[in-house]
Amino acid sequence: AAEATVQPVRRHGVDAGIFFSDIMVPLRLAGVGVEIEPGVGPVLDHPYRTRDSIDELLSHRYGEGSWTDSTGRARDCAEGAQSVRDGVATAVRELGSTPLIGFGGAPFTLAAYMVEGRPSRDHMAARVLAASDPGAWDALMTWCARVSADFITAQIDAGASAAQLFDSWVGSLSPRTYRESVAPYSRMVAQRVAGAVSPVTGERAPLIHFGTGSAPILSDMAEVGAHCVGVDWKTDLSWAIEQVPGKAVQGNLDPALLQAPWHVIEQAVRHILDAGCSAPGHVFNLGHGVPPTTDPDVLTRIVELVHELGDAR
């Protein structure tokens, strides 16, 4: 994990590294049976859709107990949690003066995987549970919030200077459902993480909150308590900044443009940087992940361009 974290910084000269992990790691290290199946994604031993199954889950704690891997071997959660801390500490040492950003999944995205039992396009079962059994949903989401916060806090304690809370599936929700059934639990994470002080900076680590397809709920996401709001490529950055007054923003180059001619990329980068000037702070990045077919040299050129234009402002 540490080497994969440091490589992009060495290769491209970006201004921060982000801890290389998986959104399912905190679930596994809380004793939940989950494996990554090739071509499918995370698959749980069983879905958590009933009050009984969720009640059984509530005794699980991050870094306690054990989980069973695909070979049937029992693995110690405490050892796994220690390996996360060690990976962060190693990455921090390797990065030197370059800060490390921690990583964690937001409660809804974790809960969606748990209720569905595997990846889903519409997260129908999770949405049904939230609407039909608020008590069970509250128990599950509170548990997910605690596990996510513990995972992120552990990374900050080990040296991460900031953290990012990813809500990959939040775009499947209506604004009302988000406000009533999801935002309170993301706020729990933000509140629990707020007290974590990075030993590297000696200060409380700022939190970035990002969700895909989040334009309809962007203003609500800004109220969760993060210091910076991530913006995906489908949302106009100038408009997004108006929705989150007083917040820094992160975003939001369309990953597809990485395949475009350089003059197209340069124009898009300049446009995003111009838009970002109206925010209290702007972290330039992609609006989603890097496509695997991307030429690494293109990424390096983008970083160089952002630095050049940023220094000139």
Task: Please tell me what each predicted stretch does.
Residues 39-94, 98:
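A gly/proline- and charged-residue-enriched helix-loop-helix capping module
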Residues 3-20, 157-158, 223:
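Catalytic domains of carbohydrate-active enzymes, especially glycoside hydrolases
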Residues 1-11, 84-93:
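Short alpha-helical segments and helix-capping/turn motifs at coil-helix boundaries
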Residues 28-32, 47, 111-116:
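Short, conserved acidic/polar surface loops in the N-terminal third of protein domains
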Residues 16-20, 26, 99-101:
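Short, conserved beta-strand segments within well-ordered enzyme catalytic domains
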Residues 32-36, 52-72, 115-131:
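Surface-exposed, active-site-proximal loop segments in enzymatic domains
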Residues 24-39:
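Glycine-rich loop at the start of a catalytic domain that most often binds anionic cofactors/ligands
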Residues 80-313:
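Active-site loop segments of alpha/beta catalytic cores
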